[in-house]
């Protein structure tokens, strides 16, 4: 069977080496004669797995010791509510920076749950020559006392990424669901980082939360116990039965990333992949991207065809040659190629070849 390259925005493709290892030991994990899905989450073998997973993630992201690493339920949307309930209290105030669909969704959830607390927001995307561009505000000029400022450095739907470090006088809460471990960041700049697993970590159903000690002293609201960061810390992410298979696969992805040189190594590859695809788009008038170069997402490349009536043919012909899940999000349409860590350079090269051939066949210059 020829190679299939899966450009899905999430759940996304996993590293082939990880999938093969999971396949090989699916029925007999660690010589126990049973699957990892069948062992107790409190057994010594699984506890050892969780400890190694945390150690590997700390090493990969250079996480300081005054941060807790949590493996939680709920995905990114679950964290939208968890952040509010854990940090805002009854009289708190928070600022949300809006750059696209996911930061808008986080804002909407905060507004729904805030009660007597105050939620402020700033739209940080402007049009520059008809292209979307991020303009980060000078937060130090805002006269307010916020518990936290929330932002999403990469908008998967809109194809917008913020590469500049956010400078804030208040704790930063960041949704890194689509960029975690794709490039190096300074974790110490953040009060809390959260990420749904289904893009760069593993299968859906698991969220990673990296939270600084002092954030856990902020007033909280009544909430579900399984989304309480303090309880998660107290119980080593096992207040209730965790998604064990997702945790296992995340551990394998961390080990795989370490084996290929870590985040610094994959960051170079990710940059190459994105540059290759954007070069194709820019060189061919048949394709267009609506984001300024400085804010083009490395993880989620969005583009439109010059003739949208050919969208169906593009997707059908791409799938026929093993390039799948290229349809853009229903909100914005067009195409989207998600280039997460597991996508090899060969997959992007195959997509570029197809795009050039498709344009030559359908576009009259």
From Swiss-Prot:
Q: Which domain of life is it from?
A: Bacteria
Q: Cofactor binding mode, per the note?
A: Binds 1 pyridoxal phosphate per subunit.
Subunit composition and interactions: Homodimer.
Q: Which UniProt keywords apply?
A: Amino-acid biosynthesis, Aminotransferase, Cytoplasm, Pyridoxal phosphate, Pyridoxine biosynthesis, Serine biosynthesis, Transferase
- Amino-acid positions noted as binding pyridoxal 5'-phosphate in the UniProt annotation, renumbered to this chain: 76-77, 102, 156, 175, 198, 240-241
Q: What name is this protein filed under?
A: Phosphoserine aminotransferase
Describe the reaction catalysed, as an equation.
O-phospho-L-serine + 2-oxoglutarate = 3-phosphooxypyruvate + L-glutamate; 4-(phosphooxy)-L-threonine + 2-oxoglutarate = (R)-3-hydroxy-2-oxo-4-phosphooxybutanoate + L-glutamate
Name the InterPro entries on file.
Aminotrans_V_dom, Aminotrans_V_PyrdxlP_BS, Pser_aminoTfrase, PyrdxlP-dep_Trfase, PyrdxlP-dep_Trfase_major, PyrdxlP-dep_Trfase_small
| Highest classification ranks of the organism | Bacteria, Pseudomonadati, Pseudomonadota, Gammaproteobacteria, Alteromonadales
